[in-house]
Design a protein with these regions (language model features):
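ABC ATPase nucleotide-binding domain signature region
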Residues: 4-7, 111
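Surface-exposed charge patches in extracellular/virion surface proteins
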Residues: 2-5, 187
């Protein structure tokens, strides 16, 4: 049997084209689709880990999609799927091609049914005490993996900041408190050292 692809998807930063036609513009709060030249806004309602739980219409009056997840992002219910947007668990794109249902974490793909990445961690030498295929250090309730390379620990007390492991690329073992201001991640005080 042969596999034939009928759609071409091109990504230019946060702009997505399908078959050469503008399809979607991603924003921090959601995304825009178009009816002719008129933009239609869709907004994400996220949980403490950045998972897109509900997609609301531009008026905020109608839920277009509701997502319920298993701990590693597998969908156990996808209700009200009038929206076909694929940015779900940890706000990562769910690639459903060929029925694989893998999340695109930029550096590598994650299989949510296994809770494992399908490729070796590019920073595996820095995390020798854990498997190089684990997602979120095997703790998806208290941690997220923003790019498939490093794990961030979330402070659940009020949801306003995240505790982020030291940047191993520059050999800094400190753990910092980060805040988000005007959409930018700002590094604050050091609260400890990684071991």
């Amino acid at each position: 049997s042969q596999i034939s692809q009928t759609n071409t998807i091109d990504y230019c930063s946060n702009v997505i084209y399908e078959n050469g036609v503008l399809n979607m513009i991603l924003t921090e709060e959601g995304y825009m689709t178009f009816s002719g030249n008129t933009p239609i806004y869709h907004y994400y309602l996220k949980d403490h880990q950045g998972n897109n739980r509900i997609i609301m219409n531009q008026n905020g009056t109608t839920a277009e999609q509701v997502n319920h997840y298993y701990p590693f992002g597998g969908l156990f219910e996808e209700g009200l799927a009038t929206s076909n947007q694929n940015y779900k668990y940890n706000s990562k794109e769910l690639d459903r091609m060929h029925g694989l249902d893998w999340y695109d974490y930029i550096a590598r793909m994650m299989d949510s049914s296994l809770g494992r990445f399908i490729a070796l961690d590019p920073l595996a030498e820095e995390y020798y005490s854990i498997s190089p295929y684990l997602c979120c250090a095997n703790n998806p309730i208290n941690a997220i993996d923003p790019d498939g390379k490093s794990t961030w620990v979330i402070n659940n007390s009020d949801g306003t900041y995240r505790v982020v492991g030291g940047l191993l690329e520059d050999n800094d073992p400190n753990i910092y408190v980060y805040t988000i201001e005007d959409g930018q991640l700002i590094r604050g005080e050091s609260i400890g050292v990684t071991t």
